[in-house]
Amino acid sequence: MNLQTMIRTLQDYWSEQGCIMLQSYDVEKGAGTMSPYTFLKAIGPEPWKAGYVEPSRRPADGRYGENPNRLFQHHQFQVVMKPSPDNIQELYLGSLEKLGINPLEHDIRFVEDNWENPSLGCAGLGWEVWLDGMEITQFTYFQQVGGLECFPVTSEITYGVERLASYIQDKENVFDLEWTEGISYRDIFFQAEFENSTYAFETSNTDMLLTLFDTYEREATRQMQDGLVFPAYDYVLKCSHTFNLLDARGVVSVTERAQYIGRIRNLARRIAKTFYESREKLGFPLLKEEGGKRHE
C-alpha cells in the first residue's frame, strides 16, 4: 500500500466514524495538536469530530536528508473526537485493520506516555502505540488546553504518517517510501529537506528572527484586544515556529528558552480564555441539545 492510498484509507475510515475531513492548516506548526482544528476545538462543551493530515515542522530535527528517520518536516494524520467515544481504542484498532494490520497477528502495545505541551499550556493522559516494536501513534485524552480544564474530554489520535508507511511498506529509509505509483518520498521532499535543514542550522538571519518574534507577539496581543481569536492564534503559531528556528540555531540560552516558552504560553492561555468566552456568548452553537453540559 503506497502512502497516498494509506492516507485515503484513514480518511475514509474516520469519515465513516462521523469525522469531518479537513485540509491542513496553512500556518507553520510543530505538531497537528497546534492546529486550531484541535487546540481551539478542544475548548468548551461543543462536540467536534475531525481528521486531517498536518505537515509538522521541527527545525531542530532536520538532518539534511541524511538520516533515514529524522526530518525537518514530517506529516501527522490527526483525529480528534469530543466527547471521546467509550470505544475509541477499538475504533483505532479498527483503523489498523483497514490498513491490513490485524491486531491479533501483531504485537500492539499501548505504552503509557502522558503528554504535555508547555508552550500551549496543554496536558493529558497519553499512550504511545507500538506496533511490533515501532512507535506509530500517540494516543491522548486531553485534560487541559490553554490552561483550561477540558470538559468533556477530547481524545486525540496522532498517526506518524512516515513511520506507519515505513512499517506497511517495509522500508528502512523514509526517502524510499512510495508516495504513489512511480513517485517516491525522495522525489517530492528530499530537496526541501536538505535546503530547510541548511536554512535552520546555517543561513537563517537570527537578528531578523528575534525581531519577528517580538513583532508577532505584539500583533497577537493587539488582535486579542479586539477579540479576534483566529488572527491572534495565527501569530501565536508564528511565534512558536520562530522560536523553534532560533532554538535550532543555538542562539537561545537555557534561561531564555524558558522565558520564550512562557511568553508563548501566556498568549495561548489568553486566546483559549477569549475563545471560550466568545463561544459562550454565542450560546455554544454546536451544542444540539439544551441538556448539553457546560464547561465550568
UniProtKB/Swiss-Prot annotation:
Record EC number:
6.1.1.14
Q: Name one GO molecular function term.
A: ATP binding
Instruction: List, alphabetically, the CDD domains matched.
Output: GlyRS_alpha_core
Per UniProt, subcellular location reads as:
Cytoplasm
- Cross-referenced InterPro entries, in alphabetical order? aa-tRNA-synth_II/BPL/LPL (IPR045864), Gly-tRNA-synth_heterodimer (IPR006194), Gly-tRNA_ligase_asu (IPR002310)
Q: Does the keyword Hydrolase apply?
A: no
PROSITE patterns per record: AA_TRNA_LIGASE_II_GLYAB
Question: Can you state which reaction this protein catalyses?
Answer: tRNA(Gly) + glycine + ATP = glycyl-tRNA(Gly) + AMP + diphosphate
Q: Which GO terms describe its biological process?
A: glycyl-tRNA aminoacylation
Instruction: Give UniProt keywords alphabetically.
Output: Aminoacyl-tRNA synthetase, ATP-binding, Cytoplasm, Ligase, Nucleotide-binding, Protein biosynthesis
Q: Which residues form a coiled coil?
A: none
Query: Which Pfam family, any one, appears in the UniProt record?
Result: tRNA-synt_2e
Spell out the GO cellular component terms annotated for this protein, sorted alphabetically and separated by semicolons: cytoplasm
Q: How does it assemble?
A: Tetramer of two alpha and two beta subunits.
Entry's family note: Belongs to the class-II aminoacyl-tRNA synthetase family.
Descriptive protein name: Glycine--tRNA ligase alpha subunit
- Which lineage do the record's taxonomy fields give for this organism? Bacteria, Bacillati, Bacillota, Bacilli, Bacillales
Point out the gene that encodes the protein: glyQ
